[in-house]
Regions:
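Membrane-embedded alpha-helical segments of integral membrane proteins
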Residues: 2-34
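Extracellular/periplasmic ectodomains of large secreted or surface enzymes and adhesion receptors
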Residues: 37-44, 55, 74-85
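Internal/C-terminal transmembrane anchor helices
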Residues: 39-66
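Aromatic (tryptophan-biased) beta-strands that constitute blades/sheets of beta-rich domains
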Residues: 72-133, 167-176, 198-206, 211, ...
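Repeat-blade elements of multi-bladed beta-propeller folds
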Residues: 90-94, 134-157, 181-230, 263-290, ...
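Conserved hydrophobic/aromatic positions in well-ordered beta-strands
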Residues: 106, 159, 232, 298-300
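Inter-blade boundary loops/turns of WD-repeat beta-propellers
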Residues: 110-113, 163, 236, 302, ...
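Beta-propeller blade signature
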Residues: 234-239, 293-307, 312
Length: 346
C-alpha cells in the first residue's frame, strides 16, 4: 500500500508537496516585502534550506537499492468459467462496451502462459516509422468476431485475417495521411442481424431505432476514425465501403470544426459503439496555439452516418445544433482517449 515509511511510496507522496513547500519558503520574503511587511527571512530561509537538503537526499536515495513494495493482501483464486459462459468474440476496443479489458476464458492463465508459442505471424505491409515518437506507430488492439480478426494500420488501412490460419481475407486501402501522429488504436463493430441490447435500469431511454439493412448491404460493419478527419464504415464481410453510410461510406468529421489544418485535429482512438450510435472524440494538438479546434464529442447513426447529437463543452447549450456556416466553440477540452458505454443505462 502507499503508506508507511517505505522509500518509494514515501517519495510518491512527498515529492510534489515538498517541491511546492520549497517554492513557498523562498517566495514568502519577497511577497512580504511587496506588502511592505518585514521579510522574516530568518524564519523562512532556514527551513527552506533544510527542505532543499531533504530534497537532494531523497533524489540521491533514488539511486540506492530499497526493499520492494510487497503485495500484502490475500491473493484471490482463479475463477473457472462455465462452458456456457465462455466468451466467443472480442467486439469492442476494451472487450466490453464499458472497457473491462478482461475476457471470460480460463484456458490460458498465469500458470501456463509461459508455454504459449506463436501459431502464425501476419505482416500488414504498413511499416511503423517513428524515430522521434511522433510518426507512424502500430498501437492497435484488434477485434475478433467469429473466425475473423480485424486489424487497422497506422495509415488506417483495414485488414481482415483468418483467426486460425493468419491468412488475409480482405484489405481496405485507405492510406490516410497526417504530418504527425499516424496511428490507429482500434475499430468498432456493428451487426445489424443481432438484437441491440436494451437498458435494464428503470427510466433509461432505449437506443434509437435504425433503418433496416438490406441483405445485400452492410449488415455487419467495421467503423473507423482516420487520422485525416473521417469516419469510415466498411462491410465486415468483404471490406467494401458501406454505401448507405454518410457519403458512400464516409462522414467528414472536419465539418463544423472551423479552421482545423493538419495536424491540429487527428483521430487515433477507436470510435465507441453506443447501442446504435457511433461516438467519436478526437485529439487536439497541445501547446500550438490559443485558437484551436474544439473538443466536441459527436454521435452518428451507425447505419446512415447521420449526426444524431453533439456535446460541445464550450457552448452554453452543449447540444445546440449548428446552423449553416457555424462551427463548434474553439479551444475546448477534448476526449482523445477511448470512451466507455454502459448498455444497462444507454
Amino acid at each position: 500500500t502507499d503508506a508507511g515509511l517505505n522509500f518509494w511510496p514515501l517519495i510518491s507522496r512527498l515529492m510534489f508537496p515538498g517541491s511546492l513547500a520549497i517554492l513557498a519558503f523562498f517566495l514568502l520574503p519577497s511577497l512580504r516585502h511587496y506588502e511592505n511587511r518585514p521579510s522574516a527571512w530568518k524564519w523562512v530561509y532556514v527551513p527552506g534550506a533544510l527542505a532543499i537538503a531533504a530534497f537532494i537526499a531523497a533524489f540521491a536515495g533514488m539511486f540506492v537499492p530499497h526493499d520492494p513494495v510487497e503485495f500484502s493482501g490475500q491473493e484471490r483464486p482463479l475463477v473457472p468459467v462455465a462452458k456456457n459462459e465462455m466468451q466467443k468474440n472480442w467486439e469492442n476496443y476494451g472487450n466490453t462496451p464499458g472497457g473491462s479489458r478482461f475476457v471470460a476464458l480460463d484456458q490460458i492463465n498465469r500458470n501456463n502462459i509461459s508455454e504459449l508459442k506463436p501459431a502464425w505471424t501476419f505482416h500488414t505491409g504498413d511499416t511503423p516509422l517513428s524515430p522521434d515518437g511522433n510518426g507512424a506507430e502500430d498501437q492497435q488492439t484488434p477485434l475478433q468476431v467469429g473466425d475473423k480478426v480485424f486489424l487497422c494500420t497506422p495509415h488506417n488501412n483495414v485488414i481482415a485475417v483468418d483467426a486460425d490460419s493468419g491468412k488475409p481475407i480482405w484489405k481496405a486501402e485507405i492510406n490516410a495521411k497526417s504530418s504527425v501522429w499516424m496511428r490507429c488504436r482500434g475499430l468498432a463493430y456493428f451487426d445489424a442481424t443481432q438484437p441491440v441490447p436494451q437498458p435494464t435500469v428503470p427510466g433509461s431511454i432505449p437506443p434509437a431505432p435504425v433503418a433496416a439493412v438490406d441483405a445485400a448491404g452492410c449488415q455487419r460493419r467495421i467503423l473507423m476514425n482516420t487520422i485525416d478527419g473521417r469516419l469510415i464504415a466498411l462491410n465486415a464481410d468483404n471490406g467494401q465501403f458501406c454505401q448507405d453510410f454518410g457519403n458512400k461510406g464516409t462522414v467528414n468529421l472536419l465539418e463544423g470544426m472551423g479552421h482545423a489544418p493538419d495536424p491540429q485535429y487527428v483521430l487515433t482512438s477507436a470510435p465507441t459503439l453506443a447501442g446504435t450510435t457511433v461516438v467519436v472524440g478526437g485529439r487536439i494538438s497541445d501547446n500550438v496555439s490559443t485558437d484551436m479546434p474544439g473538443g466536441v464529442i459527436r454521435g452518428y447513426d451507425v447505419v446512415t452516418g447521420q449526426l444524431r447529437w453533439a456535446f460541445d463543452p464550450g457552448n452554453n447549450n452543449p447540444n445546440a445544433v449548428l446552423a449553416a456556416g457555424e462551427h463548434y466553440v474553439r479551444s475546448t477540452p477534448n476526449s482523445w482517449a477511448p470512451m466507455s458505454y454502459d448498455p444497462s443505462m444507454n
